Swiss-Prot record:
Family from the record: Belongs to the methyltransferase superfamily. PrmA family.
Signal sequence interval, chain numbering: none
NCBIfam families: PRK00517.2-1
Binding sites annotated in the UniProt record for S-adenosyl-L-methionine: 136, 159, 181, 228
HAMAP family named in the record: Methyltr_PrmA
Reactions catalysed according to its record: L-lysyl-[protein] + 3 S-adenosyl-L-methionine = N(6),N(6),N(6)-trimethyl-L-lysyl-[protein] + 3 S-adenosyl-L-homocysteine + 3 H(+)
Function: Methylates ribosomal protein L11.
Species per Swiss-Prot/TrEMBL record: Rhizobium leguminosarum bv. trifolii (strain WSM2304)
Keyword Methyltransferase: yes
Protein name stated in the entry: Ribosomal protein L11 methyltransferase
């Protein structure tokens, strides 16, 4: 069944207001809600809510009612998102990736695992994160370093995608991990990958559209938070993210172009975190902070 996106095109400030409105209307219901920048120069943004086709009629009606009350001039638009399993045909071209002690590989490369490898099996699919992108590999390297160097008892993988980073933490250390994403398809894919890697009992996967989700208060605070998203949302969420970090905890951030690193470092320094290390990979950076 196809997924449906309902969205409003507007400015950044109004998109954030609509995001807050929809989050209040739908609360803990299993619908992904988010904002996306379309054109930075022209200040064009979209506020979106995602649902399966069977839920569209009810969700559409509730969204329209909410918008009429607060944003009477907003135009609600619709997009059908095809249920496509991408890159599967190119699996043979995806080679295993090494990062720290980890080897991320597809099911077709199980024979490449060597003694001593911490193997994570992830096939290309509908969610980001097979280890081939510099941001994922940088996060894996940082996770390995953090878990080696300090106690970690409770972890959060924010924007989990394929679940590869949550799986990495759990395979390194027998601790609880919360893996969240705004996209229910990504959450489902992550749960499937967790089961594939034989560690389903240690990782909780949740669809959570923002920090107002009760998932974070139920499972936190966390002494390791990993967020491989994009620089702009990482900068915006710095104050809220920091409130979920336990004393002495670590934060690993990626999805950041090298040219954007100073803005991210400034935002998290402003949230009273200390910049520890920056890992560079193919024009992208992964940044490690801790709470002194």
């Amino acid at each position: 069944m196809s997924e449906i996106r309902l969205y409003v095109t507007t400015t950044e400030s109004k998109a954030e207001e609509i995001l807050d409105l929809l989050s209040a209307v739908f609360g803990e219901e299993d619908f992904a809600i988010g904002t996306t920048e379309i054109d930075e120069k022209e200040d064009i943004w979209e506020a979106s809510i995602y649902m399966m086709a069977e839920d569209e009629a009810e969700v559409h009606s509730r969204v329209e009612d909410a918008l009429k009350a607060s944003f009477p001039n907003a135009r609600l638009e619709r997009e059908v998102i095809p249920d496509v399993d991408w890159v599967v045909k190119s699996l043979e071209g995806l080679k295993p990736v090494r990062a720290g002690r980890f080897l991320v590989h597809g099911s077709h490369d199980r024979d490449k695992v060597r003694p001593g490898d911490i193997a994570i099996e992830i096939d290309a699919g509908q969610a980001f994160g097979t280890g081939h992108h510099g941001t994922t590999a940088g996060c894996l390297e940082a996770i390995d370093a953090v878990v080696r160097s300090r106690p970690v008892r409770n972890a959060l993988d924010l924007g989990t995608g394929s679940g590869v980073l949550a799986i990495a933490v759990r395979k390194l250390k027998n601790i609880p991990v919360l893996a969240t994403d705004i996209d229910p398809i990504a959450t489902r894919v992550a749960a499937e990958n967790v089961r594939r890697n034989g560690i389903a009992s240690g990782i909780v996967t949740r669809t959570a559209p923002g920090f107002h989700s009760t998932a974070f208060s139920e499972h936190g605070p966390f002494d390791l938070i990993i967020a491989n998203i994009l620089a702009r949302p990482l900068i915006r969420m710095a104050p809220k993210l920091a409130t979920h970090l336990a004393p002495g905890g670590s934060v690993i951030l990626s999805g950041i172009l090298a040219t954007q690193r100073w803005k991210v470092i400034a935002a998290y320094s402003g949230a009273r975190l200390r910049h520890v290390r920056t890992i560079w990979r193919n024009g992208w950076v992964t940044i490690h902070f801790d709470r002194p």
